[in-house]
């Protein structure tokens, strides 16, 4: 079987499986998800062992620490993933919900109802937890899913999908509701992007190269996002003591994820007092800095190492303990910098001036905009959406963390009495 035949079979099987999924009741889907959670718990030793093999191979192949952190699925993280399944079970099922209805003058009773998309293709890199997160959200919303993870996570993904597929069969459903492309051949990615006869939406979760590939080659609607060049602006009216804690959380808590902080913009009135305090605190936590000329002069006087920032560094999603620092004259300058370099993911302002905060929120056009909060909150779980499929930085069909509703569409239902036009 060549690649085209293989992908066609995947697509046909997924489409066929999606029909039965779309008719499941909320209770049936909850029972399925509980079965998956129980089976994952029972198989945790095998799953962790498979992940340890992936991690060992990654280290042997010289992958970066950031990539290895994304790849890791130890027992603690796995149990967190399983706990998220319980959270999703508790969420309201959007499928079947009536969005609106009305009686038309012609006698038709017209309504709009949420329905599954059908088949979703997801392409992602070194994050095995995504395998479970996406499968669970897809099944909760009655969608079949075709998964293509990175070759670095192949052993982990095989172990996870084996368990999920066994749960499908146990619940009387086709195992093809969840399928994994387990061939690392990159040509299969391009083929999947053109499988528009069977796949209704593609979600790429990865870096700029993957996003660009999908945007250029897909004949299927694609949800772009996941690249987070995130900013925090420290305003003239900010509480500087509290600001340090927020910036630490946004940068240090988990620097390898897309909602981690990349650049801090500091109002000029605070530059000399605040930047040294912030840099000393963060450097003690292992953070390295790129700064504008003013920042370099301030930190140079304090004997704190800082590299020269430029457009390239401001355009970088660091995914590591590296931080850009820039002094700005005012709110307008901060907003202009964000408009120039942001990926449209998450931005925050730290200020006690409500009018400035409102101006910032209105002026910044990103998926999530915060006042006096860390960018780390841009997450499906934190937003109460359950585990997320992705964080979309586009405006159609979804924006920000994609929860259950983002995996549905709607159809028009019209009741008549043998009505003619």
UniProtKB/Swiss-Prot annotation:
UniProt key word Amino-acid biosynthesis:
yes
Q: Which reaction does it catalyse?
A: L-glutamate 5-semialdehyde + phosphate + NADP(+) = L-glutamyl 5-phosphate + NADPH + H(+)
Q: Write down the superkingdom of origin.
A: Bacteria
Q: Which GO terms describe its cellular component?
A: cytoplasm
Name listed for the protein in its UniProt record: Gamma-glutamyl phosphate reductase
Q: Where in the cell is it found?
A: Cytoplasm
**Pfam families given in the database record:** Aldedh
Could you tell me the keywords of this UniProt record? Amino-acid biosynthesis, Cytoplasm, NADP, Oxidoreductase, Proline biosynthesis
Gene Ontology terms for molecular function: glutamate-5-semialdehyde dehydrogenase activity; NADP binding
InterPro entries xrefs: Ald_DH/histidinol_DH, Ald_DH_C, Ald_DH_N, Aldehyde_DH_dom, G-glutamylP_reductase_CS, Glu-5-SA_DH, GPR_dom
Give the species this sequence originates from. Shewanella pealeana (strain ATCC 700345 / ANG-SQ1)
Matching entries from NCBIfam families are given as: PRK00197.1, proA
Record GO biological process: L-proline biosynthetic process
Pathway info: Amino-acid biosynthesis; L-proline biosynthesis; L-glutamate 5-semialdehyde from L-glutamate: step 2/2
EC number(s) given by UniProt: 1.2.1.41
**Per its UniProt record, what PANTHER family does this chain match?**
DELTA-1-PYRROLINE-5-CARBOXYLATE SYNTHASE, GLUTAMATE SEMIALDEHYDE DEHYDROGENASE
Q: Which family does it belong to?
A: Belongs to the gamma-glutamyl phosphate reductase family.
Q: What does this protein do?
A: Catalyzes the NADPH-dependent reduction of L-glutamate 5-phosphate into L-glutamate 5-semialdehyde and phosphate. The product spontaneously undergoes cyclization to form 1-pyrroline-5-carboxylate.
């Amino acid at each position: 079987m060549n690649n085209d035949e293989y992908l066609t079979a995947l697509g046909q099987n997924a489409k066929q499986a999606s029909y039965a999924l779309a008719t499941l009741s909320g209770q049936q889907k909850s029972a399925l998800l509980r079965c998956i959670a129980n089976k994952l718990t029972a198989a945790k030793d095998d799953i962790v062992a498979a992940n340890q093999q992936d991690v060992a191979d990654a280290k042997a192949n010289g992958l970066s620490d950031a990539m290895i952190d994304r790849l890791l699925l130890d027992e603690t993280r796995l149990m967190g993933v399983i706990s998220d399944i319980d959270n999703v079970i508790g969420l309201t099922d959007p499928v079947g919900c009536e969005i609106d209805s009305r009686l038309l003058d012609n006698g038709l009773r017209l309504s709009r109802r949420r329905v599954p998309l059908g088949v979703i293709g997801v392409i992602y890199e070194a994050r095995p937890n995504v395998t479970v997160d996406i499968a669970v959200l897809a099944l909760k919303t009655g969608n079949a899913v075709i998964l293509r993870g990175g070759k670095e996570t192949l052993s982990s993904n095989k172990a996870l999908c084996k368990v999920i597929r066994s749960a499908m069969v146990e619940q009387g459903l086709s195992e093809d509701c969840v399928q994994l492309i387990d061939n690392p051949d990159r040509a299969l990615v391009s083929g999947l992007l053109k499988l528009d006869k069977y796949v209704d939406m593609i979600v790429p979760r990865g870096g700029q190269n993957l996003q660009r590939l999908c945007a250029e080659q897909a004949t299927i609607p694609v949800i772009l996002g996941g690249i987070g060049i995130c900013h925090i602006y420290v305003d003239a009216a900010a509480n500087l003591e509290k600001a340090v804690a927020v910036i630490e959380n946004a940068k240090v808590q988990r620097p390898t994820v897309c909602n981690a902080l990349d650049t801090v913009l500091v109002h000029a009135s605070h530059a000399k007092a605040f930047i040294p305090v912030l840099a000393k605190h963060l450097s003690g936590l292992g953070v390295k800095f790129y700064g504008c000329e003013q920042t370099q002069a301030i930190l140079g006087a304090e004997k704190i190492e800082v590299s020269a920032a430029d457009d390239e560094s401001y355009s970088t999603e660091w995914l590591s303990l590296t931080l850009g620092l820039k002094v700005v004259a005012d709110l307008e300058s901060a907003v202009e910098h964000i408009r120039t370099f942001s990926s449209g993911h998450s931005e925050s302002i730290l200020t006690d001036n409500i009018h400035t905060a409102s101006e910032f929120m209105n002026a910044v056009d990103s998926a999530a905009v915060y006042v006096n909060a860390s960018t780390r909150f841009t997450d499906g779980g934190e937003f109460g959406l359950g585990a997320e499929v992705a964080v979309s930085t586009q405006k159609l069909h979804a924006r920000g963390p994609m929860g259950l509703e983002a995996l549905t569409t709607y159809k028009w239902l019209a009741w008549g009495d043998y009505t003619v036009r």
